[in-house]
């Protein structure tokens, strides 16, 4: 039975999972790597840490499964999106640490671009807004702030890529510089209607075309790994950004289906089919996947802080020692207290898009303690999801019929407390699948589809299995009171923004 290996390169760790041809998991491995915070609002990774942990986990997973390179039909790659690496075109040496998607150092630059009235043009082409979140302004920062970088780029000596592209380059020994349409669509440089890099956007941000990778289908032959990495060459046949990969892993192939992934951040995608839908509620229009040269689009809401709120409880406050303690602790909170955490640690994402505000707690009393803080942290994820859910229902014309169930995945979905509270606040069922490694599964599926190991999308969708459906159990009065309190807290935080 052949294996398909998924590389899942995330914000805080790298993972590798071997899937059998029946979509069951044979083995997995994971390694965390350091985060670097050189200034307020700045987040960086060492590219060598990304590479080293990726290769180490691939080898570890293969060892656990007793698999050789010959046993693996294909590799699929999924990755933290928007994070930028720029490297020397010959040596492969990065010119700077990777600038992570959470990084806000280009906020002032983005504000200037908006003030010049450029956002409508950018949004019309990319489906995105002008925000530090996306890759384009990060690349511009590197070219302008690393000594000699712009001159080298203009001479064709530098390459740019999101993390998938960087890993593909390294895996193929520098032979392949390519990405897929989902990752390209997150750069601010890619026209999602034409399916190509856009010269007007490249000129706007000062990015030479020679730096850019080829854009391919999400399921395609991207290249082959060099033999010395895994004891033999393995073909690489699938790439998708992490949230799009999770959409595929959740089998959201039908327009109107919606999934929400809970990792470091929270990201909800609504499949809108072959037509890109323009949001009137500050959601993003993005490429869900591209198969056979045909793009499928999605509306996306991006939240910057979800699981990282729990990390803050553990690492910042010392309230818990392990993430699994959060739900039971929250269950002990004083119901008479209404404590709200607005976790804008790096600004606010959809649907507010404010890079300047920072997190705040509201409703603290003398009796507020660890249980109330845990409660507020978990509920903040649910409230933020509600904001995305409401925006999607407003933007999607068939909302009443289509977006009635939310498929969830990611580490936080292991918390029954959080998932039940999510169903309560959405007033809608929340479905948790049997296979919760949906991001890796999506990458594996794309690779296995190209390699002929996995079936066509509809047959794959028929194999999706439900683990548990969380049904709303909160009274309408309680739900409305809690949502109103959240809205007041958000307004209170936004009122602290004095602009640039």
From Swiss-Prot:
InterPro entries: ATPase_NBD, Carb_kinase_FGGY, Carb_kinase_FGGY_CS, FGGY_C, FGGY_N, Glycerol_kin. It catalyses: glycerol + ATP = sn-glycerol 3-phosphate + ADP + H(+). Sn-glycerol 3-phosphate binds at residues 11, 81-82, 133, 242. Pathway: Polyol metabolism; glycerol degradation via glycerol kinase pathway; sn-glycerol 3-phosphate from glycerol: step 1/1. Its EC number is 2.7.1.30. It comes from the Bacteria. ATP binds at residues 11-13, 264, 307, 311, 411. Glycerol binds at residues 81-82, 133, 242-243. GO terms for molecular function: ATP binding; glycerol kinase activity. Inhibited by fructose 1,6-bisphosphate (FBP). Pfam families: FGGY_C, FGGY_N. ADP binds at residues 11, 15, 264, 307, 411. GO terms for cellular component: cytosol. It is an enzyme of class 2 (transferase). Signal peptide: none annotated. Keywords: ATP-binding, Glycerol metabolism, Kinase, Nucleotide-binding, Transferase. GO terms for biological process: glycerol catabolic process; glycerol metabolic process; glycerol-3-phosphate metabolic process. Key enzyme in the regulation of glycerol uptake and metabolism. Catalyzes the phosphorylation of glycerol to yield sn-glycerol 3-phosphate. Belongs to the FGGY kinase family. HAMAP family: Glycerol_kin (MF_00186). This is Glycerol kinase.
């Amino acid at each position: 039975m052949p294996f398909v290996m998924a590389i899942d390169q995330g914000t805080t760790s790298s993972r590798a999972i071997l899937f059998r041809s029946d979509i069951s998991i044979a083995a997995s491995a994971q390694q965390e790597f350091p985060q670097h915070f050189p200034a307020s609002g700045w987040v960086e990774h060492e590219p060598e840490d990304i590479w080293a942990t990726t290769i180490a986990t691939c080898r570890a997973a293969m060892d656990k499964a007793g698999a050789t390179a010959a046993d693996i039909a294909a590799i699929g790659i999924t990755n933290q999106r928007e994070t930028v690496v720029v490297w020397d075109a010959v040596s492969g040496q990065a010119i700077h640490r990777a600038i992570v998607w959470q990084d806000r150092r280009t906020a002032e630059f983005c504000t200037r671009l908006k003030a010049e009235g450029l956002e409508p043009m950018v949004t019309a082409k990319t489906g995105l807004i002008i925000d530090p979140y996306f890759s384009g302004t990060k690349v511009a920062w590197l070219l302008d702030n690393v000594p000699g970088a712009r001159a080298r780029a203009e001479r064709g000596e530098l390459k740019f890529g999101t993390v998938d592209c960087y890993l593909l380059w390294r895996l193929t020994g520098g032979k392949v510089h390519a990405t897929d349409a989902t990752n390209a669509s997150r750069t601010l440089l890619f026209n999602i209607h034409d399916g190509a890099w856009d010269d007007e956007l490249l000129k706007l941000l000062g990015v030479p075309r020679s730096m850019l990778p080829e854009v391919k289908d999400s399921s395609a032959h991207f290249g082959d790994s060099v033999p010395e990495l895994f004891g033999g060459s393995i073909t690489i046949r699938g790439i998708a950004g992490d949230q799009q990969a999770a959409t595929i892993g959740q089998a959201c192939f039908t327009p109107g289906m919606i999934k929400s992934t809970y990792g470091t951040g929270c990201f909800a995608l609504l499949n809108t089919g072959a037509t890109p839908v323009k949001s009137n509620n500050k959601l993003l229009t993005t490429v869900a996947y591209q198969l056979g040269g045909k793009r499928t689009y999605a509306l996306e809401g991006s939240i910057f802080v979800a699981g990282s709120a729990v990390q803050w409880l553990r690492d910042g406050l010392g309230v818990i020692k392990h993430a699994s303690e959060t739900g039971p602790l929250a269950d002990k909170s004083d119901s008479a207290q209404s404590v709200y955490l607005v976790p804008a640690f790096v600004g606010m994402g959809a649907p507010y898009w404010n890079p300047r505000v920072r997190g705040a707690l509201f409703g603290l009393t003398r009796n507020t303690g660890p249980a109330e803080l845990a409660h507020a942290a978990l509920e903040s994820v649910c409230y933020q999801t509600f904001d995305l859910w409401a925006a999607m229902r407003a933007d999607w014309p068939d909302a009443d019929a289509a977006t009635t169930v939310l498929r969830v995945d990611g580490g936080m979905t292991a918390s029954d407390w959080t998932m039940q509270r999510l169903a309560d606040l959405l007033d809608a069922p929340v479905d948790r699948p049997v296979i919760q490694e949906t991001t890796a599964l999506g990458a594996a599926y794309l690779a296995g589809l190209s390699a002929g190991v996995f079936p066509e999308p509809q047959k794959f969708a028929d194999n999706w299995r439900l683990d548990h459906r969380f049904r709303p159990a909160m009274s309408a009065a309680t739900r409305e009171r809690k949502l109103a309190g959240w809205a007041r807290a958000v307004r209170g935080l936004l009122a602290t923004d004095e602009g640039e």
